[in-house]
Amino acid sequence: MINWLLFDKDGTLLKFDETWSEISLVIINKFIEQYQVEEEQSLQEELGYVDGKFLASGILASGTLSDIVKKFQKNANHENNKEVEDWTIQLSKDLIAEYNPETVVIDDMQNTLKHFKDKGYQIAIITSDDQDGTKRFIKDAGVSHLIDDTITATINGYQKPDPKMVEDFYAKWNVVPEEIAIIGDTPTDIQMGRNSHFGVVVGVLSGTGEKSDLEEADYIYKDINEFYEKETEWNGR
């Protein structure tokens, strides 16, 4: 029986394109200017931006800032990797402050999470974002009273799809993998569910992933609202 719902954030609870796409492209352009990188298209493709689209499996859609830093260090042709890292981290902070991206959530997201809570489910967010970004989302989205925990890429050094990312979570809440459903929009989310042997692995089409990207999921739904509507299909409570 499923008791815990682990929701990915960007693309699952949050509309990725409307929130992060502009900043993602500005970061690339600023890096190219700063380090005089000539292969713009090649860099974009390495980061998962191809033919004007964010790839579901790409770093920009499902990776961390640390992943971006590593790609920048590779492409900067600069001896001082620490300088590239510091510059990228500071740029990310500056752009978030400058653009102040609006938190655009999936339609009816708050009500759907509340319906799950009313039915007795516990809810966590599992994300490649850091703690600060995740807390900001929870506050801006007005769902702090609905979220029981957050599992982020910075809490223990592991990130999706590494199952070690959730080991502390199991101990904290005395929960086993079979009681957990993970819901996400990228192949990384699906692989996280498989690697961790979660009870149910769900793909949603509200983010960057297409149906073909999520074929390893147990179920694929339009969004979290359809996931709620089809509860009897994935959980025999």
Question: Which residues make up each language-model segment?
Answer:
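N-terminal helical cap/lid subdomain that shapes the substrate entry/recognition surface
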Residues: I2-D107, K119
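Conserved phosphate-coupling serine/threonine residues in phosphotransfer and NTP-handling enzymes
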Residues: T12, T127-D129
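Residues that cap or flank secondary-structure elements
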Residues: L60, T64, V104, I126, ...
